[in-house]
UniProtKB/Swiss-Prot annotation:
Protein's name according to its UniProt entry: Ribosomal RNA large subunit methyltransferase H
Assembly information from the UniProt record: Homodimer.
Organism from which the protein derives: Klebsiella pneumoniae subsp. pneumoniae (strain ATCC 700721 / MGH 78578)
Keyword rRNA processing: yes
Gene3D superfamilies linked: 3.40.1280.10
SUPFAM superfamilies in the record: alpha/beta knot (SSF75217)
Length: 155
């Protein structure tokens, strides 16, 4: 199974690249984790936000292909670390690759939400999207460590 983070935005601060890359390199060869960056639509005074969301959503769904789609969204289910580890095990048993979708400033398109088999809420707080990348990578790595009895996670 391959994990894929599909996120809107392409120019992240160095600390995001460093943090995300650190967890990326830790993932085992049998569970590769990749980042697919979707260019954010141009926003401005007269921007058609609905159209921008649609376009970003189309690109996200195209990147996900036939993968299981999990959206990251405030109204999603709040999984604690052991629950995320159980979800990771279910995903592995399912046999499909998994795409986790992170929207842009206005969130996810209705099409992305409709295509999702699951929706995961990291927090009821509004989080900066660059930080979400690092949080997701660390959370998935920690969940993997639980499923393999790796010493990274401690109770």
């Amino acid at each position: 199974m391959k994990l894929q983070l599909v996120a809107v935005g392409t120019k992240m601060p160095d600390w995001v690249q460093t943090g995300f890359s650190e967890y990326l390199r830790r993932f085992p060869k049998d569970m590769p984790f990749e980042l697919v960056e979707i260019p954010a639509g141009k926003r401005g005074k007269n921007a058609d936000i609905k159209r921008i969301l649609e376009k970003e959503g189309e690109m996200m769904l195209a990147a996900a292909g036939k993968n299981r789609i999990v959206t990251l969204d405030i109204p999603g289910k709040p999984w604690d670390t052991p629950q995320l580890a159980r979800e990771l095990e279910r995903w592995k048993q399912d046999g499909r690759d998994v795409s986790l979708l992170v929207g842009g400033p206005e969130g996810l398109s209705p099409a992305c939400k409709a295509a999702a088999e699951q929706s995961w809420s990291l927090s009821t707080l509004t989080l900066p999207h660059p930080l979400v990348r690092v949080l997701v990578a660390e959370s998935l790595y920690r969940a993997w460590s639980i499923t393999t009895n790796h010493p990274y996670h401690r109770e």
